Amino acid sequence: MEGPHTRALAEHLNDVVTGKMVERILVPEHRWQANMLLLNCVGQVVQRVRSHGKWLFFDFSHGISWVCQLITKAKWAIVPTEANEKYLTPPPPPPTPSRPHKRHRPPLITVCFRAQTSTPPIVAILTGHPAFFILPTEKVWAHPEIRALGPDPIGSPDFHDDFPYRLRQHPTRTVAATLLDQEIVAGLGNALKCEILFATRFSPSAKIGALMASQIDRLASSVVALVATATTFAGKGLPFPYRVYDRAGLLCTVCNTEIAVDRSGQDAHLSWYCPTCQPVGQEPNLFSA
């Protein structure tokens, strides 16, 4: 899940569960052996849900945070009220299946939140295989995976200073590769990378060392603008209107040139781009479609 979708999810969860007390937590015994650190959050109040890049943070009133990255089809979801009982009933031990890959898997975590005893509970479920840590809130940024993250385009107030500085430490790398480096900028995926390159007129082969200061500043502004726009679309459940990503062979909406694909990236990510609209740093590419 890319940063904009993670932020939109964090904002939704924050609206729904902040200020609510954790009434129950169900953890399938065959998975996590009723992890006591997790269950110690029962009776605590959610202070806020926030995000940084592709990571979610649930901060609780007793100084503990859940830190979660939704990878490998992992997902947080709020259960419709009418389905609460289905998820609040502890699942039976799983039978030995004849075809394990067809087995229905229960949620990894089921959390029941409640504001008042007279109101229906709010049930949230975590499914899939996320990266998940339980940490003291004050030490979250000391965790190696979190400490290594670069600035968040719309969550870090010093982004316009920090991002260019980190970028300039890699003069021989392409802009395309650095935009996917989570230690340089947190939350970008390949789709937004392609759109940012298009917005700034940078070729996928453009090198950091060849950019002027004004071009790097323009790149930083485009990153912020496109991440903010993508977050708005994600929050409304709308598809992002991509102009180059995954549009190989279609005509550019600006100049009518066919969208091409650059396959030369050493990180194995494809870059969709317009050869006419993105001349900055363009080099002969023997691998174009």
Labelled PLM ranges:
Residues W66-G187, L192-A199:
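Phosphate/anion-contacting hairpin/loop surfaces
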Residues S51-G53, R103-T110, D246-A248:
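A short, compositionally biased
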Residues M21-R24, Q44-V49, I78-V79, T89, ...:
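Short secondary-structure junctions
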Residues H62, A115-T117, A268:
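Acidic/polar residues in short coil/turn loops that connect beta-strands
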Residues M21-L37, C41, R50, D162-A289:
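Basic, nucleic-acid-binding surfaces and adjacent catalytic neighborhoods in DNA/RNA-processing proteins
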Residues L56-F60, V111-F113, W272:
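Generic recognition of long tandem-repeat/solenoid scaffolds
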Residues H5, L9, V27, Q33-M36, ...:
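N-terminal functional module of multi-domain proteins
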Residues M1-I25, R31:
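General N-terminal leader/first-domain-start detector
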